[in-house]
Amino acid sequence: MAESLRMVGYRSVALTIPTAILNECSRTLKECFAQVGLETVSRIDLTCSNRYELLKLLRRFRNQYDVVSVKCTNQNVAAIACRDRRVDVVFFDPNNRKMKFTHTLARLLNGALELNLSFLLDRESSDALNKAMRQMDVAREHRVKVVLSSGCTSPKMVRSPMQLRAIGVTLGLSEAQSAEAVSSVPSSIIESNLERRSPLYIEEGVRLVGRSELK
């Protein structure tokens, strides 16, 4: 997997690591990817049934992971996830016909909307594709940040950054938006969170400055 990702042009990847093995396996996984020249960041996907569960998990895991994403299973969870600045990415299950990325949610969203292409490529029905195109329409109208990810779990599912960009344009994003969705948007999320986890970080816009930096 690591070699396949490197060969198609990736320089860094986000690894979705279950909480049960975070401390035990994350170092080993990072070493495997580092051997082929890939940087890695840890990611957690939160799936919650209500706002209280989501807030509890955010308090527990925000500082343990580089990227926090939330699956929007219902309107209450979606609204909280879009508003809460601790959430980096929200995504919607294309099989859940009751949940849509609406104009209201777009106005609330502080993070980014993720489109996982494995959901599209693994479906014979056109429903998932139509839903993804509607999401991109809303995102484009409200200038929402978008992340395009391959969601690959095997080498066969790996898609190059260029392929992701092409799919983004097909779904309705502009060339510039599609390029940002596979480069600058995910990069800015990672950089911001790495800074937030730094011992020099106090709060948004405030950090400790050493004497050497003042000279």
Which residue stretches match the model-derived regions?
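Short beta-strand/loop segments at the ligand-binding rim of alpha/beta enzyme cores
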Residues: T40-S42, R62-V68
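Active-site mouth loops of central-metabolism enzymes
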Residues: M1, D45-T47, V67-K71
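Glycine-rich phosphate-binding "P-loop"
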Residues: G37-T47
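Charged catalytic cores and adjacent phosphate/nucleic-acid-binding surfaces used
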Residues: M1-T16, L22-V36, Y52-N63, N76-K215
